[in-house]
Amino acid sequence: MPSMRSATTHRRYDCRLPIALAWLLSCAASTALAQADAGAAEEITAAPVVETPVETPADNVEANERFVASTITGYGRNSLQTAEAYVGLADAQRKAADYEKAAESYLSAVEVYRAIDGPFTPLVIAPLTSLGDSYREAEDHTNAVASYGEARTVSRRVYGLHNPDQIVLLDRISESLLDLDQLVEAEAQQVEALRLIQRANAPESDAVLSAIYRYAGWLGDRGMFQLERDQYMRAQRIIRQSYGDSDPRLVTPLLGIGNTYRRERNPAGPGISALEDALELLREQPQRDALGLAMVMRDIGDWNTAFGKMGYAGMEYQRSWELLGTLPNGAELRDDWYAGANYVLYEPISQRGVSTEREAVAGHVLVQFDIDVAGNPGAVTILESDPPGFKDEAVLRHVRRSRFRPWVVEGVVAPGPGLAIRVDFRYLPDAIAAESD
């Protein structure tokens, strides 16, 4: 049986791009002091410093409350202007983390829209979706599912049972069901999203293939690697039957198959064979796909690094780096792929002591390390942990047993210094206290 979603997450840091993987940098700001010219004929008086008041979330809520009141006075309770004002108030209350009041305001907006345009007006879809998002942020996942479901009901009634716009709502329902540890029900939403695309498009269309890959990725993110491979193989069969054995569309499922084995930490032969088949297929194409070739070579390099090929010198990494130099966004891709902490073999983090209960509180561990040219971590050090010592050993073991993509600097495989990863988790303080006793 597949495991439930992990209660831990990890973040990696980049001083330039918050979502990229990079090393910690110490950022210092310098201030220049202006001096008056000693020979100046006129005395220059410094302008008084005026402090600009900083608006707080509470200030924004009060302003929106006043706006709602004035809008009702000016336009009446059941008006589009009033409904929009309620949505603005709800957004402000949500930003201030007053989720109970935010729910009331979103529901007031829904009530007004329905009074104006009927119970199935499409105007309620957006506030109902935002209401679900607010419930999720408040960790009220049951009500989140209900709100998203109501928004989807309206969408199906207005735009048709098979309209693709409801897929974003299915995704939200799926995520909330995962939060409730209802994996089977969550997967059912993803299957329904795939079926919606299949009903609206030809079986061999790019839209259907993309939907299959999307579902495959969802399965892989939950650790269901064989089921993920099954979807890639399904796409492979569709492409071969519709476009032939040499169509470049085959590259995507081949890479998907190969990388599932690596992410599963399974060095089975079919994994590297799929990657090599993708490379051969691209080389046979009449027009060179530099990005595709760079990606395949990167993934072959990741396989060799992950499974410790003896004497591997990173040839595929170097060739991939060179190919990226021919692309308009090559510099950005080089930075994304060949700098920072990029896993090639992910050692699972022990879930002992972590909790998905609603009353669980947040904890984290921040760890720093280097990687050598073979992708091995070294000098692994805990920089910060909360609560101290609770998950330190688990995170240290995770980093030491994982493997990372080495850097490529000016075309040469190089070590990566001073990388950092933050692992976030939730735990029950009482459980820790009982364990220590």
Q: Where do the model's predicted regions map?
A:
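N-terminal secretory signal peptides that target proteins for export/translocation
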Residues: 1-15
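Bacterial N-terminal signal peptides
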Residues: 18-30
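Charge-biased low-complexity segments
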Residues: 35-57, 61, 65, 74-83, ...
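Non-catalytic localization and substrate-recognition regions of ubiquitin/SUMO ligases
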Residues: 94-95
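Membrane-interface segments of envelope glycosyltransferases acting on lipid-linked substrates or membrane lipids
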Residues: 137, 169, 182-183
